[in-house]
């Protein structure tokens, strides 16, 4: 037998073995997901008596939060009210007027401790059950370490991380079996992003917090999903993110390609959460991004981002 024939057989065996291992792990993963879905389906419905079932949405005044409110209003059965939380009362009131479901408007700045106290008081005094919690409040600013002010960096950490954790912990005592939580992370959580470093790091924190929280809440039959979209082209996020860049200077990110509409993100992530899945990547590009972030070295991902942001 020649060397080439031997090499060919070795390669064939390796490919065949790798394929069998991959199929085995895929089958195991599918079985585990199905078991988890059955556990959720078998969870006893909470006996809430006279309590109203509400959906609590932060960052509801615009963008993705607004789309979640509209979609829940159209599709979520059994909700008595949708609680809308954001800073801009006028926008919240305008959105409340568009919804058919009952609403409760809470104009709060979640970076302030007194706002968390007000939220907790409202939940307790209203005697409600939080059926759905969606943490959409978020902030991103583009720029390297020299371009971003300390205030910009601190605000991103406050809104994206501390406020999300505080709202979640505040709402959890009011949730029962069958409750659902969606934490809005980002594909930025999958790798470091130069010129977007603080934002990406803040989303890494929220992503890992959400994954850990999901395991902690399994015994309570509360479904927790980390929602990781790519750019959303029809929200205020991109204009606000670019606000830190001075006029006339070369932009750190030239194009925001492969963006998806916010309503698609809301629709797909809600469906993923209902199925009890841990992560939602609502779009082809963000799904590919997540897959390759697990395979490729960080250095390769960093150089790929460097290329992508210059296109």
Predicted stretch roles:
Residues 61-62:
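Conserved glycine-rich cofactor-binding loop
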Residues 76-94:
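Conserved glycine-rich Rossmann-like NAD(P)H-binding loop of the short-chain dehydrogenase/reductase
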Residues 136-141:
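Conserved NAD(P)H cofactor-binding loop of Rossmann-fold oxidoreductase domains
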Residues 144-145, 149-154:
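Substrate-binding pocket helix/loop in short-chain dehydrogenase/reductase
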Residues 168, 202:
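Active-site helix of classical SDR
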Residues 186:
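Residue(s) in the substrate-gating loop at a strand-loop-helix junction
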Residues 226, 247-290:
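C-terminal helical subdomain
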């Amino acid at each position: 037998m020649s060397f080439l024939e031997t090499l060919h057989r070795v390669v064939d065996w390796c490919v065949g073995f790798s394929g069998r291992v991959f199929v085995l792990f895929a089958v195991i993963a599918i079985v585990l997901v199905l078991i988890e879905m059955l556990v959720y389906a078998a969870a006893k419905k909470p006996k809430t008596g006279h309590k109203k079932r509400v959906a609590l949405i932060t960052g509801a005044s615009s963008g993705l939060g607004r789309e979640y409110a509209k979609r829940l209003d159209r599709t979520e059965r059994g909700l008595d009210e949708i609680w809308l939380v954001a800073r801009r009362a006028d926008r919240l009131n305008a959105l409340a007027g568009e919804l058919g479901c009952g609403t409760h408007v809470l104009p709060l700045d979640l970076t302030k401790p007194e706002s968390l106290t007000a939220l907790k008081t409202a939940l307790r005094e209203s005697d409600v059950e939080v059926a759905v919690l969606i943490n959409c409040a978020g902030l991103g600013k583009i720029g390297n370490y020299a371009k971003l002010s300390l205030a910009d960096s601190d605000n991103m950490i406050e809104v994206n991380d501390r406020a999300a954790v505080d709202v979640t912990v505040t709402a959890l005592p009011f949730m029962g079996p069958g409750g659902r939580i969606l934490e809005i992370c980002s594909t930025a959580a999958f790798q470091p992003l130069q010129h977007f470093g603080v934002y990406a790091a803040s989303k890494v924190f929220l992503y890992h917090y959400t994954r850990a929280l999901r395991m902690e809440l399994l015994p309570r039959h509360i479904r927790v999903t980390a929602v990781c979209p790519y750019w959303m082209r029809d929200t205020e996020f991109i204009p606000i993110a670019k606000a830190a860049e001075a006029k006339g200077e070369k932009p750190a990110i030239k194009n925001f390609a492969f963006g998806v509409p916010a309503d698609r993100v809301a629709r797909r992530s809600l469906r993923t959460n209902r199925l009890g899945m841990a992560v939602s990547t609502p779009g082809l590009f963000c799904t590919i991004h997540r897959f390759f972030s697990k395979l490729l070295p960080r250095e390769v991902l960093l150089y790929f981002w460097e290329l992508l942001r210059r296109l």
